[in-house]
């Protein structure tokens, strides 16, 4: 936004009782009495600063407040409505109430996949009930897992199908009262005796529940800290989940070696190639570890797209559960001997299906 654009912003009557940022609104009112600043030009540089519902003060104040998905800084030492023009020594003063066109307001608009509405009481209650159902069912089912564990180690030490059946039962009980899963492409799943590397986008804590409900005996990769959690950590250990210590290169190498060993023994493994949950619903870049394992062992890569879990339980809001349904798309297996090719093809399939 240059100086000419700044000067073209005209005063406008109040459309809203408080400042908002929404790509659905044609105009946005930014009011000085709320101490909101949209932009500043100084020394040829443009900076955007916003602060909602701040209390004005005569003294210097430096604050950091959240607007949408952006972190913004505000200082009351300078007039936020004064724009400096390099071509002219004088400054131009904006009106008290200003209106910004939608193309400028979109700069501070969060991604539409994960808006940040006010959390409803019903979502909080659903989140509490979800935790209660999952906790009670896990407490009872862990007993079956413990009883059967010696036999699993004796007869099925790598795939551990019995434990995965218990995990599927637990996940199905936990999510059944709260949301439905629509699955597409079940015919693309390899047989239970065919090892494969499964990869998926990662949006929410609910991704694990959703994937366990598929009933496939694949081994997840999980942070070592989760293994110490009672019941959940015990179940993960008995299922053969592969531990990984983040930011530890040696642990990463050991993790990949363990995955290759499992694949050679007939078990499947599951990776979230993004490495973490997405905070805005967008697909991040893929790490190549999963595809290196597939290329070296010669097994297929099965891409899976998850949609809807991030809206039901957004990242960072694990205590709430919104209404909604989940869509799972299982893509055709990908074969190849080059990790780069496998990585690009798998990501392309997931990205294309997310744009539908």
Curated annotation (Swiss-Prot):
It comes from the Eukaryota. Disruption phenotype: Embryonic lethality due to embryo development arrest at globular stage. Widely expressed. Expressed at higher level in leaves. Expressed at lower level in silique walls compared to leaves. The keyword Cell inner membrane does not apply. One of its GO terms (biological process) is CDP-diacylglycerol biosynthetic process. It is a multi-pass membrane protein. A motif (HXXXXD motif) lies at residues 202-207. Disulfide bonds: none annotated. It catalyses: a fatty acyl-[ACP] + a 1-acyl-sn-glycero-3-phosphate = a 1,2-diacyl-sn-glycero-3-phosphate + holo-[ACP]; a 1-acyl-sn-glycero-3-phosphate + an acyl-CoA = a 1,2-diacyl-sn-glycero-3-phosphate + CoA. One of its GO terms (cellular component) is chloroplast. Its main location: plastid. The HXXXXD motif is essential for acyltransferase activity and may constitute the binding site for the phosphate moiety of the glycerol-3-phosphate. PANTHER family: 1-ACYL-SN-GLYCEROL-3-PHOSPHATE ACYLTRANSFERASE (PTHR10434), 1-ACYL-SN-GLYCEROL-3-PHOSPHATE ACYLTRANSFERASE LPAT1, CHLOROPLASTIC (PTHR10434:SF60). This is 1-acyl-sn-glycerol-3-phosphate acyltransferase LPAT1, chloroplastic. The gene is LPAT1.
């Amino acid at each position: 936004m240059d100086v000419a654009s700044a000067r073209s912003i005209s005063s406008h009557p109040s459309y809203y009782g408080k400042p908002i940022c929404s790509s659905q609104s044609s105009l946005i009112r930014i009011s000085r009495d709320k101490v909101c600043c949209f932009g500043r030009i100084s020394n040829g540089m443009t900076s955007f600063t916003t602060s909602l519902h701040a209390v004005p003060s005569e003294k210097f104040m430096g604050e950091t407040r959240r607007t949408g998905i952006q972190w913004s800084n505000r200082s009351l030492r300078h007039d936020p409505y004064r724009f400096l023009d390099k071509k002219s020594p004088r400054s131009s003063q904006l009106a008290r109430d200003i209106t910004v066109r939608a193309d400028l307001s979109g700069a501070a608009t969060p991604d539409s996949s994960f808006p940040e509405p006010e959390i409803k009481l019903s979502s909080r209650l659903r989140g509490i009930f979800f935790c209660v159902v999952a906790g009670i069912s896990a407490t009872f089912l862990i007993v079956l897992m413990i009883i059967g564990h010696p036999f699993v180690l004796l007869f099925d030490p790598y795939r551990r199908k019995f434990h995965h059946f218990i995990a599927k039962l637990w996940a199905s009980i936990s999510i059944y009262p709260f949301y439905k899963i629509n699955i597409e492409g079940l015919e693309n799943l390899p047989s239970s005796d065919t090892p494969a590397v499964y990869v998926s986008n990662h949006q929410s804590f609910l991704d694990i529940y959703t994937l366990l409900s598929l009933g496939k005996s694949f081994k997840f990769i999980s942070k070592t800290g989760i293994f110490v959690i009672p019941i959940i950590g015990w179940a993960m250990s008995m299922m053969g989940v592969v531990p990984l210590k983040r930011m530890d290169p040696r642990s990463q190498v050991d993790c990949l070696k363990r995955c290759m060993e499992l694949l050679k023994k007939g078990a499947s493994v599951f990776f979230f190639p993004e490495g973490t949950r997405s905070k805005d619903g967008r697909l991040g870049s893929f790490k190549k570890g999963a595809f290196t394992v597939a290329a070296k062992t010669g097994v297929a890569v099965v891409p899976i797209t998850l949609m809807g879990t991030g809206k039901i339980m957004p990242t960072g809001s694990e205590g709430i559960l919104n209404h909604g349904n989940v869509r799972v798309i299982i893509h055709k297996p990908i074969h190849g001997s080059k990790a780069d090719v496998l990585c690009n093809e798998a990501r392309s399939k997931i990205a294309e299906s997310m744009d539908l």
